[in-house]
Amino acid sequence: MKESAVRFLLAVFLSAPMGAQAEFSITSTDGLVTLDNGDSIRAVVAPPHGGELSGFAIKVDGHWRELIYRAMDYSEPSGWVGKSPFLWPAPGVSWTEKEGKHHWVLDGEVRNMPGHGFARRLEWVTREQKTTENHASVTLEMTGMQDWRNDYPFDYTLEVEYRLLKDRLQLVYTVEASAENTGPMPFSIGNHVTFKAPMLDVGEAGDVKFYSDFPDQMLREETGVFAGRIIPTKYPGWQPVSALPHRYAVSLGGMNGEAELLVQDPSGLWLKLSHRASSEPQDPVIRFNLWADTEEGFFSPEPWLATQNSLNTGAGLIPLAPGGKWTWKIDITPGFSALPETGTEQD
């Protein structure tokens, strides 16, 4: 589609306020659950596939425009699978000097931990679906944890509520440790959400821009893990995705509280990603982990509260006490009007 046509469609979209006369609905097909706000946003969730967000679409001039890379595609694609794998209990690589990758040590015993953790590999089940005049939501619970109990010897429940509102999608993760655990349950957390680049049919992948005001960039060692090296960010303010290294993660942090990152498509569409937790790990903590491939056409602005190898180093780790409860909320907000205030002008 030509740029002029897309911009016209966006103008048509703006002629009706987002969320006007919305009638929220939930449908299920082939194991996937679709939340629709009856107006302009639709989200698809995949309980059998790690409980992940499998699709996120906006409606422009009566047509749905999918923004997620490889949305609802559960074939065997070559390369990155896309969508939005949930990273728990250890985003990134776990590494020990003696055993190498995919290992961690608890109470002196070496245990296995796959890259990005095991939650994305498990089946989740639907616990509740609900529609009101203000939202549609589905709550999923992770199952199959006993298969990993030798490597992660804790009892707990882990749920996510996908809540579609009139103007945004909210993900609410809840971790509750069993009161029978004999000590704190350590974990870190992330979401590998991956968007198409460009999201609409305008411009090139490298023309997508992102904005952050995080002062720090956390560097990885040759082993792929964070070992304490922090430098001033090389990506302040507005930056093109083309400035990011090819398929090499850029880890940003250095600020506490709610974390935000903006993404702007060449079409004029923008997304605001924000996340916050009921309690935070002590710094250093990666707040957003950026990963991109402009040749394949995707950009992952991943919300994290973690560092690579957190189970071994303790950096970015959340120690949840027996009987404790912890929540993490992510908001994904689309828009086409003026960008949210950033305090800086784009080039």
What are the functions of these language-model segments?
Residues 2-11:
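Sec-dependent signal peptide recognition
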Residues 15-17:
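N-terminal signal peptide c-region/cleavage motif recognized by signal peptidases
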